[in-house]
Amino acid sequence: MKQQSTKRFLWFRHNDSFFAAPLENLQEILNQLVLRPIPGADACLAGLTTIRDIVLPIFDPSAILKADASSKKSASYTIILAVEGVPRFGILADEIGKVMEFPPATALSQSARLAFAFGGEIETKHRKFVVLAPDNFARAMELSPVSAPQDSVLNAVSAS
């Protein structure tokens, strides 16, 4: 019998949804950050913050998942993810779980934007996790390739 390959993820919760982020893309987890909202921006962009003199966009995964503009735009934690070739970005989280190994995710049967931003879903005995695909997520959120670190983030956010 062929054994399924597994991948390590950090699970987290925001609002009433559970998510899993690949451990290989996790850069750091920060406590509450001050977010500067961007008037007229997409509802999934919770705001901008500055970390060590670099401006980062912070996204609300619940707003993307549920297309809900009324989603809570604050959280106890911000998970900073790094993907080669695009600026770092953050994801809001209310609860940080633990590192777990999961088999490959099954595809989401949702809108094209959702299916692209998220890498599918994984169901365990206790809950269902929406898997974040950071490289696809960065493209879905239109984060520009890195050339000038701060300019690329600001250009991507202003294009939203």
Identify the function of each model-found stretch.
Residues 1-160:
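An acidic, low-aromatic, low-complexity terminal/linker signal
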